């Protein structure tokens, strides 16, 4: 067993991509009358893409990135704006 902490790297290009995708998906969910936050949380927890509407191709768009990449951006944003 290796006790070394593994380093997880996340580059600026991916950060921008995550922001753009979340923005598009959020907008599509809002337009269809869904609670975008609840739907995104459902998707992030379960991995079930049916939490995301097909409107404006949002379901296909969200699947362009991995859920861990989305979570990384959310955690980073929260830390940057609330702790540091």
From Swiss-Prot:
Pfam families: IreB. It comes from the Bacteria. InterPro entries: IreB. NCBIfam families: PRK05473.1. Belongs to the UPF0297 family. This is UPF0297 protein Csac_1773.
């Amino acid at each position: 067993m290796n006790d070394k902490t593994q380093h997880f790297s996340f580059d600026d290009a991916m950060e921008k991509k995550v922001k753009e995708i979340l923005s598009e998906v959020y907008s599509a969910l809002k337009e269809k009358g869904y609670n975008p936050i609840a739907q995104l949380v459902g998707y992030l927890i379960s991995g079930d893409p049916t939490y995301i509407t097909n409107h404006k191709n949002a379901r296909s768009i969200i699947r362009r990135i991995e859920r861990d990449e989305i979570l990384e951006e959310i955690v980073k944003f929260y830390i940057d704006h609330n702790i540091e």
